[in-house]
Amino acid sequence: MKFDVLTLFPGMFEGPLTESILKRAREKGLIDVALHNIRDFAFDRHSVTDDYPYGGGAGMVMKVEPLAACVEHAQAGSPEARVILTTPHGRPFSHAVAAELAREEALIIICGRYEGVDERVRELFVDDEISLGDFVLTGGEMAAMVIIDAVSRLVPGVLGSEESAINDSFADGLLEYPQYTRPSEFRGLEVPKVLLSGNHQEIEMWRRHKSLEATALLRPDLLQSAKLTNGDRKYLEKSSKDAR
């Protein structure tokens, strides 16, 4: 999986890409992240990449010429890549979107800045627009980092255990069940006995029920699209009655 990131601040990616899972994935050749400094594609000696908006208004707008040149440079190496713009206008990012993007061979991610990009960049190059949520970030770099991390986790071989991705929160539309490790007791709080029983069928049932409970309590909106069995629905109905 290849990621081409178009940014004014490539240094922001140094930490996330050189630690933990992403570092190992890059070392194994499972993912490739290429950073492209948009300033390198400016047409003047001052490397100007933004300008005042036509029609007036506050802030600056990212210029079309350097962005166009930068996108075309990335496309030369990844001609089949989907071009993504990080922007508040975009569709909300989710596990389902990450899974969709993970099926691509390559992604080109444009990191928006300031008041946004010249609209002609959208018209000429952008295939998809993605937002992390209804809040404002300083720039699209942090959104790009989140996209790279979430998508990379779904690339075969990136995680130590394939079950890790399957059991992640949201993988089946539900929040994850509670996790415990040693010691079995801490300050009077004990690990649920079922997890120590060795009965894998009961453990799986406990985890499923706890996942359903957490989702119903914290993110009930997810239940509308979650993959629920008849047993799940009966358990939720019983839990709701017991809580009254």
UniProtKB/Swiss-Prot annotation:
Subcellular location, principal: cytoplasm
Reported function: Specifically methylates guanosine-37 in various tRNAs.
Record-linked HAMAP family: TrmD
Family: Belongs to the RNA methyltransferase TrmD family.
Family annotation (SUPFAM superfamilies): alpha/beta knot
Keywords recorded for this protein, A-Z: Cytoplasm, Methyltransferase, S-adenosyl-L-methionine, Transferase, tRNA processing
Key word Methyltransferase present: yes
InterPro entries, A to Z: Alpha/beta_knot_MTases, tRNA_m1G_MeTrfase_C_sf, tRNA_m1G_MeTrfase_TrmD, tRNA_m1G_MTases_N, tRNA_MeTrfase_TRMD/TRM10
Domain of life from the UniProt record: Bacteria
GO molecular function, one term: tRNA (guanine(37)-N1)-methyltransferase activity
Subcellular location(s) of the protein: Cytoplasm
Pfam families for the chain: tRNA_m1G_MT
Provenance organism: Geotalea daltonii (strain DSM 22248 / JCM 15807 / FRC-32) (Geobacter daltonii)
Gene Ontology process terms (BP): tRNA N1-guanine methylation
Reactions catalysed according to its record: guanosine(37) in tRNA + S-adenosyl-L-methionine = N(1)-methylguanosine(37) in tRNA + S-adenosyl-L-homocysteine + H(+)
EC numbers for this chain: 2.1.1.228
Quaternary state and interactors: Homodimer.
Annotated protein name in UniProt: tRNA (guanine-N(1)-)-methyltransferase
GO CC list: cytosol
Gene that this polypeptide is encoded by: trmD
